[in-house]
């Protein structure tokens, strides 16, 4: 195996007691790591003695996010995957099988009872390693969660031998999947925006009765969102709209001011990133954002109406992610190429100055949002693990 990141003192270490051992395969991007961490937290609540191991690679966000959350991380060789299948599994590059061998070693090390996979290049080796070898290696049960509207290659492969399959939305391409939503951290799902609103607006310097637009494009920001919204700053201010804009740590935001701002103009608060998304969500009335699965899940879980601007890459997954909320009336989709300053000023002003319409969108977004997905995925995995033949044989001794 590659280098190993050990848990903080007092964390959940590796041992071989009677507690259930769960391996989470969700490394790489935030869209894979964050749902895995939400499920880890839910597992710890449902089964306080559970032993949790996250599987990841040295190049993924998990090297920072997993230890920060207090969980144990094991690293394997990264295996970037194509978006579409390209031949039989036997023809996959040798590094895949190296990653599978490393993953088998991890599963043995932690005496895994169940693997929960979230797709991506960490999940595929985990699914293959969990299959076992008749007469040589025991099979380990697998639970799959698909966050995107269109399932990726890893989860489509894992589907063949998975014991339970769950998804964020219907028709993800995974046959027999149970729709539960996207696992979201408890700090977001438990958020009461109205109760926190006064504190949140004071934190960012907004008036209690402000009309607040929140803009963010993910952890690195989004250049097209930055340009369109910042160029509309004067028009938004003239309409009484305050803005909280997370532009990304690598980006510079230029506010164009064709008119002289007055002392009573609503503030335009620009920050590189937001480390308190709960306060940002509580302060906002409307959001402009991308439509990655995790973003849509969080925004709808807290009941915020949104203008979703799908990232114009891939197979159109981001647009599909937003459609359930949009079709329910909780948001709208604007193509990246159509996001102009004029459109921003027109749509944002129109929504924030029409309380009945905004209230209807808010209610629709909240209705679509899932707040218990993490607990449902965690419970499914615990149920599968307890029923596994290898677990039953192990009662009173090692497997």
UniProtKB/Swiss-Prot annotation:
The record's subcellular location field reads: Cell inner membrane
What pathway is it annotated to? Cell wall biogenesis; peptidoglycan biosynthesis
A GO cellular component entry from the record: plasma membrane
Entry EC number(s):
2.4.1.227
Q: Which UniProt keywords apply?
A: Cell cycle, Cell division, Cell inner membrane, Cell membrane, Cell shape, Cell wall biogenesis/degradation, Glycosyltransferase, Membrane, Peptidoglycan synthesis, Transferase
Bilayer topology reads:
Peripheral membrane protein
InterPro entries to which the protein is assigned, alphabetical: GlcNAc_MurG, Glyco_trans_28_C, GlycoTrans_28_N
Tell me one GO molecular function of this protein: UDP-N-acetyl-D-glucosamine:N-acetylmuramoyl-L-alanyl-D-glutamyl-meso-2,6-diaminopimelyl-D-alanyl-D-alanine-diphosphoundecaprenol 4-beta-N-acetylglucosaminlytransferase activity
Q: Which residues cross the membrane?
A: none
GO terms classed as biological process: carbohydrate metabolic process; cell division; cell wall organization; lipid glycosylation; peptidoglycan biosynthetic process; regulation of cell shape
Top-rank taxon of the source lineage equals Bacteria
EC primary class: transferase
Q: Which family does it belong to?
A: Belongs to the glycosyltransferase 28 family. MurG subfamily.
Record-linked HAMAP family: MurG (MF_00033)
- Its job: Cell wall formation. Catalyzes the transfer of a GlcNAc subunit on undecaprenyl-pyrophosphoryl-MurNAc-pentapeptide (lipid intermediate I) to form undecaprenyl-pyrophosphoryl-MurNAc-(pentapeptide)GlcNAc (lipid intermediate II).
NCBIfam families attached to this UniProt entry: murG
Q: What is this protein called?
A: UDP-N-acetylglucosamine--N-acetylmuramyl-(pentapeptide) pyrophosphoryl-undecaprenol N-acetylglucosamine transferase
The organism encoding this protein is Mycobacterium marinum (strain ATCC BAA-535 / M)
């Amino acid at each position: 195996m590659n280098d190993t990141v050990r848990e903080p003192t007092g964390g959940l270490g590796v041992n071989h007691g009677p507690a259930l051992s769960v391996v989470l395969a969700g490394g790489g991007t935030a869209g894979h790591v964050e749902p895995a961490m939400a499920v880890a937290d839910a597992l710890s609540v449902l089964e306080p003695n559970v032993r949790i191991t996250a599987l990841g690679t040295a190049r993924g966000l998990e090297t920072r996010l997993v230890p920060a959350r207090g969980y144990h991380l094991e690293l394997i060789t990264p295996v970037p995957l194509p978006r579409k299948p390209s031949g039989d599994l036997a023809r996959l590059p040798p590094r895949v099988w190296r990653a599978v061998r490393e993953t088998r070693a991890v599963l043995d090390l932690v005496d895994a009872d169940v693997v929960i996979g979230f797709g991506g290049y960490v999940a595929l080796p985990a699914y293959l390693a969990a299959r076992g070898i008749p007469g040589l290696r025991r099979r380990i049960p697998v639970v799959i969660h698909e966050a995107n509207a269109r399932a990726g290659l890893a989860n489509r492969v894992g589907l063949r031998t998975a014991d339970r399959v769950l998804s964020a939305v219907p028709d993800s391409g995974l046959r027999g999947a149970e729709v539960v939503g996207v696992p979201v951290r408890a700090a977001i799902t438990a958020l009461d925006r109205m109760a926190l609103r006064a504190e949140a607006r004071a934190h960012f310097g907004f008036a209690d009765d402000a009309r607040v637009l929140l803009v963010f494009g993910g952890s690195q920001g989004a250049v097209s969102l930055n340009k369109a919204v910042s160029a509309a700053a004067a028009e938004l201010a003239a309409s009484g709209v305050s803005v909280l804009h997370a532009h990304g740590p690598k980006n510079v935001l230029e506010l164009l001011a064709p008119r002289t701002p007055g002392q009573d103009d609503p503030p335009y608060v620009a920050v590189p990133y937001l480390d308190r998304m709960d306060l940002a969500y509580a302060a906002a009335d409307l959001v402009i954002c991308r439509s990655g699965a995790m973003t849509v899940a969080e925004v709808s879980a807290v009941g915020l109406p949104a203008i979703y601007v799908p990232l114009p890459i891939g197979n159109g997954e981001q647009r599909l992610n937003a459609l359930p909320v949009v079709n329910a009336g909780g948001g709208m989709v604007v193509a990246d190429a159509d996001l102009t300053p004029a459109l921003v000023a027109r749509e944002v002003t129109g929504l924030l100055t029409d309380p009945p319409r905004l209230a209807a969108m808010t209610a629709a977004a909240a209705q679509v949002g899932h707040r218990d997905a993490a607990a449902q995925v965690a419970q499914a995995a615990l149920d599968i693990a307890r029923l596994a033949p290898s677990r039953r044989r192990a009662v009173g001794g090692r497997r």
